[in-house]
Amino acid sequence: MATGKVLRRAVKAAAAGMIHYSGMRRAMAAYRRSQSGGRRILIVSYHRVVSDFTGELQRSIPGLLISQETFRRHLEEAHAAGFELASIGDAVDVMNGRRVAKKDLCVVTFDDGYRDVYRYAYPVLKEMGVPAITYLPTAFISTDKRFNHDRLFHLLRRVQERRFRPLYDSLPAPALQLLGPILSGQKTVSASLDDFIGEHPTRVLTEIIDALEQQLGGGADLVPEQGDIMNWDEVRRMARDGFEFGAHTLGHTVLTLEPQEVVEREILESKRAIEREVGITVRDFAYCNGWYSDEVIRVLSANGFRSGVTTEDLPNRIGGDPFTLKRKVLWENFSLGMLGDYSSALTGCQLDDCFGVLGMSSPVPGKRPHFISAPTVGNQLSSAPVRVSPKPATSNEIVLGPETATTIQEAP
């Protein structure tokens, strides 16, 4: 597994060097600009900006992390690549034809409201005069709570460290899907967790966390110290300096796995909380896990939102749908060269989407049919999803079921 990653990194770094120094990068950027309707609109997404990447890597989900130094260099690279660092509103206006951009646009976004963003990203953005928007799951703001993905990552690492063998009979049924590949060595904790979270609603994740904590014997060491979230005073301070905030549900909820009443509550109460606490109008939304559906978009459109951002790594096009904005999710290793150090050539090629032009990337679709999980049966939860929308799946839809991204098992 590690050898394959190193080989892929080496191939990509070598290709980036050739593209960058041969002048092909400029031609590819021009091609993407033409494809996008005359202006590129790049939206980049970050989660946690940290002071010590290597140290934090030992206890946190790697793909959420970027060092403050690398983050600063990304902003410098975007500027050097000819992008105007703009707001989400500017991007929507250009896409809708209400504004003509003189340059390509790059929008900086943050998901989840981690306190690291306030500590380490905010000072850099302020110093460089770069606008940004942070999407907040409001039930976590000004609390000591941690996200389910951070709690699960922490617990799974404890399971590994203790060489603990869980009692599956007393765990919710879907736990085997999460733990099996990790304990067998087929997947890393991060990879298994990433696959699992997108397939199961919040209540399943919470039940697995509670059951694992009980089996591991409880104790303070089962709750991660890292991953703390901003408080409202910090949010207000950033807002006073012109930084924007959008809604990201109440409880970091993957909405395509929830019934309609939950979707509406998660969206509207998140929006209202920010407006009440910060005194701003909230018009922008980020889909948790990057997943959205027609049903979710209808709720946003009917309630004063102007945009929704996905995690689909694809070009945004002039005239495109502002509720399916594409984003490039970035972290530290996004810029890692062949020798494991920062590569300006690789970063520039990534920002210019050279690998997308060459067909070397495989974007994950964010549009999903709208499902909820089957109800609890006894003390066991079925992981088979139930379609909310009555229409059958089409060839363009990605239908998720247990342990597969292409098939569906209907609940009885």
Model-found features: residue ranges?
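Extended, charge-rich helix/loop segments that form flexible
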Residues: Q35-I41, S45, K145-D241
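A short acidic, amphipathic alpha-helical/loop segment
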Residues: Y120-V124, E234, E295-V299
